[in-house]
Amino acid sequence: MKCKPNQTRTYDPEGFKKRAACLCFRSEREDEVLLVSSSRYPDRWIVPGGGMEPEEEPGGAAVREVYEEAGVKGKLGRLLGVFEQNQDPKHRTYVYVLTVTELLEDWEDSVSIGRKREWFKVEDAIKVLQCHKPVHAEYLEKLKLGGSPTNGNSMAPSSPDSDP
């Protein structure tokens, strides 16, 4: 665990920072996704998400993060997968699908850091994310391939006899 000004960072036993994020969709058709401006690079777009707090479940963390970063409430859906980023720092992000039911006019990050949000067609979102945050583009690419909990990335190692 490490302390940051307004949060405590948590790590799993393998040293990965525990994160959670949501692909926030305008409707259950999942054809328009909400992206937020990056806090470091305000002219670039990212998927809302962040670090999990101690004792927090991934789904709860994902809902909290999109409320803080994107100012949305919604219906939490399926776990799309667990995505690993092995660069320093290492992250392991639980990515959920959320259908937006409420857009707040003002929200925490819009007031404190001027964060913006914008709806994108999925194909356009993939293009803008590939430049700045390729791992975020992977979330949407997986969704297009029919990602669901049964075929999501798994953190469990495969058994030796399952290799071809």
Swiss-Prot record:
Residue stretches in coiled coil: none
Ranges of Polar residues composition bias in the record: 148-164
GO biological process, one term: diadenosine hexaphosphate catabolic process
Subcellular location field: Cytoplasm
Cofactors named for this entry: Mg(2+); Mn(2+)
Enzyme Commission number, as recorded: 3.6.1.52, 3.6.1.60
UniProt-annotated binding residues for Mg(2+) 2: E65
Keywords associated with the record: Cytoplasm, Hydrolase, Magnesium, Manganese, Metal-binding
CDD domains in alphabetical order: NUDIX_DIPP2_like_Nudt4
Keyword Magnesium listed: yes
Motif Nudix box: chain residues: 50-71
Primary residence: cytoplasm
Protein name: Diphosphoinositol polyphosphate phosphohydrolase 3-alpha
Lineage: Eukaryota, Metazoa, Chordata, Craniata, Vertebrata
Gene responsible for this protein: NUDT10
